[in-house]
Amino acid sequence: MHNSRTTAGLLRAVLIVVALSGLVIGATGRAEAAPGGPQPVPKVDLSRYLGTWHQLAAIPAPFNLVCARDTRAHYSLGDGGDVVVRNECTTWAGTPNTIIGTAHVVDKKTSAQLRVRFPGIPNQGGPDGPPNYVIVGLGSDYSWAVVTDPSRLSGFVLSRTPALSAKNWRDVRKAIADAGQSDCLYLTSPTTGGLEETVPLCTERS
């Protein structure tokens, strides 16, 4: 059973998503973004991109409401060249949550646009559909990445470590802006060894 603290945390997460949903639509409509969606990075070495990433910030969405903290993505090479995606986090009840899916590289030229699919989610379409995972920012040492989608309604700040340097955070914010998004739409993700609060990224100056 959920205790009162768990229920309060989940309710707070729901209210954040509801409050920001209109802001996301308004902000993306005002963004000075190139037509046809955000520009992916010129080239991704998929072998270097594989491994574990910590989610340090994200645009709230219904599918990640279950996660309270320590959200991570593990990417490994699967059969046929597709990527096996294992997302895990700690829920509001303090229990582990894991979902496993696959990612198919849609843009063979850059390898920066993929189509990610998870089981049990309706209306996803086939693996050869349009991309829904676009890498728009990537550290030269593959220490951080910024990911969105063609509509710019989702967004994730990923890091190899639980915390980023001030310089890397500046690079992350620039990548978000260059993608036609506002860093105020991103909320920091509580991470052991990193940021512990959930606040708009534009107010966090680590």
Where are these regions (language model features)?
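A beta-rich soluble binding module of mature secreted/lumenal proteins
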Residues: 2-206
